[in-house]
Amino acid sequence: MRINRYLRLFAAALVLFFAGVVYAWSILKAPLGEEFGWTPAALALNFTITMCAFATGGLVSGLLAKKVPAQLRVAIGGLLGGGGIAAVSFLSGEAILLLYLLYGILAGFSIGMVYNTGITTPTGWFPDKTSLSSGVVMMAFGFSTLVLGKVLQAMFDSPAFGWRKSYLLLGIGVVVVSLLTAPLIRTPKPGEVPPAAAKKATPGENFPPLGMMKRISFYGLFFVCTFQAAVGNTMISFAKDFSLSLGASASLAVTLVGLLSVCNGVGRLISGALLDKLGLRKTQYIMALVLMTAALSGLAGVLAESLVLGVCALVLCGFSYGFCPTFSAAATLHFYGGAHYPLNLSIINMTLIPTSFMATLAGGLVESSGGYLGVFLVLTLAALLASVVNLCLKKA
């Protein structure tokens, strides 16, 4: 039976929606700190470990792409990742190293495998809509924190569940969804892609990983993705406190954090549509404009103590952050071809490692200076550098 390619896209989006919960650490960590007395710094370290393992898992998935079927990578990644999350429910207060091992390393690494597979596989079914298909699954991944995060928060507060049962059910959910969707997530066989779609595909020159890494454009792309993601990731890390500093009420600050997440998800879909409609070059100009406007709005908001400008900065940072993964996927495919796409993209996604440390450094700057002026000066400089380099990226 021929399965519609949109059903396969839905399967990839669904598994990434559940896998994306690994990013909801700001919510998932709360009951652990309360029950075990683990410090914010110790819990923050777990997220850094998670991001490093996530990027490494994506790299391993890329290395295995030509040897291990996508279905098997999703199934194994989901099984181990969900198992790691579920195992956290059995932790005691003396076992923070086990938290790092189970959630940080095991779940982070395994879900990184699922992410790489879920992002790269749909493009084979949509050669006519590569960026839009990537944007759809990336939006699902981004919305996970907002939707599942709220569900988990309610479960934590409910006497019927509590944090232990919530972690257990979450892990089981990741396992079940991964195993159910895995059979649908595979690369197309010859003749399976609709002829009308295949005709629109425009394959370019194919670069193997080492060939890609010999190109100056690779380092430019890595730089752009690192600094653009750093701006968004940093803003996410202090969005609530930043809003409060500009006079927002506690409830409004929480709402604005949610709004930033929504914009992040929508930005992934919009950027995918723009990339397919306008092409890479024109989208790069839009991307640079949004990033610079976001950083300058935040800086102006701090200087003028304006909540309105602060809200603009949060919204635009969300959109800008959403552009980043879709752009990196499209640029990798456009510059370096599809023959080695899963592995090449996993190498580009190693930007997650330096990015995860930048948000921590920004938090230290806020703490030491007692305000956000220094941070936004740094973010504006980072945005400027990323935008300039981005506009210089024209070919492989």
Task: Explain the meaning of each model-derived region.
Residues 32, 113-126, 133, 323-336:
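Intracellular juxtamembrane helix-capping segments at the cytosolic ends
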Residues 141-187:
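Helix-loop-helix hairpin linking two adjacent transmembrane segments in secondary transporters
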Residues 32-33, 64-65, 151-160, 243-244, ...:
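Interfacial helix-cap and linker-helix signal at transmembrane-aqueous boundaries
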Residues 80-93, 291-303:
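C-terminal ends and interior cores of transmembrane alpha-helices
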Residues 25-29, 213-269:
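Extracytoplasmic gate region of multi-pass secondary transporters
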Residues 260, 269-270, 277-331:
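C-terminal transmembrane helical hairpin of 12-TM major facilitator-type secondary transporters
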Residues 96-112, 309-323:
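Hydrophobic core of transmembrane alpha-helices in multi-pass small-molecule transporters
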Residues 57-70, 268-279, 367:
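Helix-to-loop junctions at the C-terminal end of transmembrane segments
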